[in-house]
Amino acid sequence: MSDVVQKSAKAGGVLAATCISTLVVNANTSAVSILLPAISEDTGTSVGTLQWAVTGYSLVGAAVIVTSGSLGDVFGRKRVFQLGLLLFVVSCVLIALAQSGGLVIAGRMIQGAAGATILACGLSLLSVANDGDAQLRAVSLWGAAAAVGAAAGPLLGGVLVDVTGWQGLFWIDAGVALLCMVLTFVTVKESSDPDRPPTIDYAGTVLIALTLTPLILGVTKSADWGWFSVGTLGCFAVSIAAGYAFIAVEGRVAVPLLDLALLRNRVLVGSTIAILIGAGTINGLMYLLSLYFQDPAALDFSPLEAGLATLPATVGLVVIAPLVPKLAAKLGGRQTIGVGFALTTLGFVVVGLVDASWTYAAFLLPLVAIAVGMGMSNGPASSAATASVSENDVGGASGVSNMARYVGAAVATALAATVYGSVITNQTDDGASASDALASGLAAASWLMAVFSFLGVLMAFVIARHRAAKGTWNDAAAAAAAHTHTLPTSATAGRSGPEQG
């Protein structure tokens, strides 16, 4: 076999292993909210407690997403990628065998580390295995796999709950991850970055977790403890102290988790906040609707019906994704971001008007509006994050925005769950019917998401004009994947700062 054929076969193996594993990770992540009522029924753990299966995943992912990429650069990308796959298999088996909510949550937190490692190192492996146009095609396919996985997850989860029980998703994912491990072992060549200093910012990783964990704990327990209780304020104090310590550490380490100098870039800061808001609101929405649609006092959907109910939103994302780069190139990146968040805000405002008489048909248009708005804002925001910095800083900017996605998902889901549960409890205590209390909880949480989305509109004014992506197939894939990962676009290479356009 010639060297060219061997190289092509190896590159194909890398592409298959990384794309399949990414699709599985994202499908698993987006499916879990649909599974929560079934897990709650089997384990006897309240849905409110099980929200940690969602927020815990994102919390750990936020701490690990950048570090795992650094570990791959230093110790070998193939080695760390396979470690991520192994952890993913272990977490799936642990969750599938779990008899308690605590084990499910623990498994999901392990899965957060595994998923972040697979995403970070998988993209690095693709970049190393290909160059030029082949690299663009490979990254485009990876982005498409990420988007398809995230979109298909809720429907897949709903189907499997009805057919195999909620455990089926995790057994299937474990099997696919094992196959990816074998494929990686056979086809992927080890690589590392010999020019990178062999130091890892472990302190920064720990401090990110110490910043987020008490923050989310304080938010989720505030309804029981009180917002101004010693416990809640203590959690917030620990979070603030850890945040300050993180900033101090990042200013001193040789290779920081977060390059603080990047925070002087207005476009990067604005786009990162926009990315955080977008990821937070879409994850908060999926959590809320998964519970509301399946509650017997609300729409009483089966898991399959709840999964099918997300299809219009998925279709909205799929339809808008190829159009976003061209739209951004024509209107301008920040204008597209602003219009997208305005549409999302409008959708949440409509959902905020929900009452117990609503059928699914009443949710249809606002859900599509939210999804299309997300698709319009996330792609250009991701493009702006990397196009606003020099070529040498693209990796750092991408790391910042990807960390922001996990942070947004963790914090917004915790806030949405807290508001939803608190309002339901208060309404029930005041004598409201279960259906009215549920509708009031969803309305209150939706208004909160609307406020966050409106902040995204304001971020569009913070972001300076920048050169938008030109509308290549790679840009379309990047836009489609933007609610899960920041990918390079045609506006990224060789950038040195914001530009008119």
Describe every region a protein language model picked out:
Residues 39-40, 71-72, 156-164, 219, ...:
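Interfacial helix-cap and linker-helix signal at transmembrane-aqueous boundaries
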Residues 11-27, 32-34, 47, 203, ...:
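12-transmembrane solute porter fold
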Residues 1-186, 323-324, 339, 345, ...:
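Transmembrane-helix bundle of Major Facilitator Superfamily
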Residues 1-10, 194, 463-501:
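Intrinsic disorder in cytosolic terminal tails and internal cytosolic loops
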Residues 135, 174-193, 209-221, 238-253, ...:
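C-terminal membrane-cytosol helix-exit motif in multi-pass small-molecule transporters
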Residues 8, 44, 74-77, 97-98, ...:
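Helix-loop interface residues and adjacent transmembrane-helix termini in multi-pass membrane transporters
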Residues 39, 124-125, 129, 159, ...:
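A residue-level signal for alpha-helical anchor/packing sites in multi-pass solute transporters
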Residues 3-12, 133, 181-209, 251-269, ...:
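Flexible interhelical linker loops that connect adjacent transmembrane helices
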